Amino acid sequence: MSSDLRLTLLELVRRLNGNATIESGRLPGGRRRSPDTTTGTTGVTKTTEGPKECIDPTSRPAPEGPQEEPLHDLRPRPANRKGAAVE
């Protein structure tokens, strides 16, 4: 990526964020847009209910008992296939 294009992308990001610099010029109308801020207040409440440990709802249940894990997820292939690596 050329340095001119990199500078142009950086300038675009700065303008979108409201952080325009002297080198990048001014926004039309001579006004600079302030960065987005959260105007409302945010509160955090402590709850005592629920499990003591973190549980990921997207995770699969733990297996019951020892299970052998495959070394890889690929199908077994014959060793004499065309283009096979020589071991």
Swiss-Prot record:
A GO CC term assigned to this protein in UniProt: host cell nucleus
Consequence when changing residue 50 to D: In strain: Isolate CRNP5, Isolate CRP3B and isolate CRP3A
Start and end residues of each stretch annotated as Disordered: 18-87
Keyword ATP-binding: no
Domain of life of the organism encoding this protein: Viruses
Compositionally biased residues, Low complexity: 36-48
Effect of mutating residue 59 to G: In strain: Isolate CRNP5, Isolate CRP3B and isolate CRP3A
One GO biological process term: symbiont-mediated suppression of host apoptosis
Pfam family, one: BDV_P10
Keyword list, A-Z: Host mitochondrion, Host nucleus, Host-virus interaction, Modulation of host cell apoptosis by virus, Phosphoprotein
Impact reported for residue 21 to A: No effect on interaction with P protein
The record's account of how the chain is modified after translation: Phosphorylated.
Consequence of changing residue 42 to I: In strain: Isolate CRNP5, Isolate CRP3B and isolate CRP3A
Region of interest called Nuclear export signal, as start-end residue ranges on this chain: 5-16
InterPro entries reported in the protein's UniProt record: BDV_P10 (IPR009485)
Impact upon substituting residue 20 to G: In strain: Isolate CRNP5, Isolate CRP3B and isolate CRP3A
Signal peptide: none
Keyword flag Phosphoprotein: yes
Compartments, as annotated in UniProt: Host nucleus; Host mitochondrion
Note: The P/X gene has 2 overlapping open reading frames. One encodes the P protein and the other the X protein. The p24, X and p16 proteins are produced by ribosomal leaky scanning.
Function noted in UniProt: Plays an essential role in the inhibition of host apoptosis. Mediates host mitochondria-mediated apoptosis through interaction with the mitochondrial antiviral signaling protein/MAVS and thereby promotes viral persistence in host central nervous system. Within the host nucleus, regulates viral RNA synthesis and polymerase complex assembly.
Subunit structure: Interacts with P and N proteins. These interactions presumably promote nuclear targeting of the X protein in infected cells. Interacts with host MAVS; this interaction inhibits MAVS-induced apoptosis.
Protein name (Swiss-Prot/TrEMBL): X protein
